[in-house]
Amino acid sequence: MDAIATIVELVREVVEPVIEAPFELVDIEYGKIGSDMILSIFVDKPEGITLNDTADLTEIISPVLDTIKPDPFPEQYFLEITSPGLERPLKTKDAVAGAVGKYIHVGLYQAIDKQKVFEGTLLAFEEDELTMEYMDKTRKKTVQIPYSLVSKARLAVKL
């Protein structure tokens, strides 16, 4: 596991227990933006998060990060508590299951019917298989995608 992945896992271990319902920890990213190191913690709740929510969560999360010993951060960083946005990543099976009926974008490790990217409505997620309806030019088609082939999935905005 590389240093960044280790930091993300350490942060997840201490942050997950302090984020309580109705909030949900969606993702954690740590990396350089410009010359600054940024620790981004993506949090959501059913009706969406507000600026006050992010301020409250910062007050809860920041002190917890200071308890990690030894300090895993090699340099000073900025803490960012934020919403995952409209195109929220679907990084777990539970997240995919919660997206049934929604419009999603799926990237694959290996092509199905000569396609490695599908965008459409997730009709079902059962027994480790996604069933999606998508448009192929002017025709609606359905595709079965084994979860093991999914490299990346996120909610998508239908234009």
UniProtKB/Swiss-Prot annotation:
Keywords: Cytoplasm, Ribosome biogenesis. GO terms for cellular component: cytosol. Its main location: cytoplasm. One of its GO terms (biological process) is translation. It is found in: Cytoplasm. Gene3D superfamilies: Ribosome maturation factor RimP, C-terminal domain, RimP-like superfamily, N-terminal. Required for maturation of 30S ribosomal subunits. NCBIfam families: PRK00092.1-2. Belongs to the RimP family. This is Ribosome maturation factor RimP. The lineage of its organism: Bacteria, Bacillati, Bacillota, Bacilli, Lactobacillales.
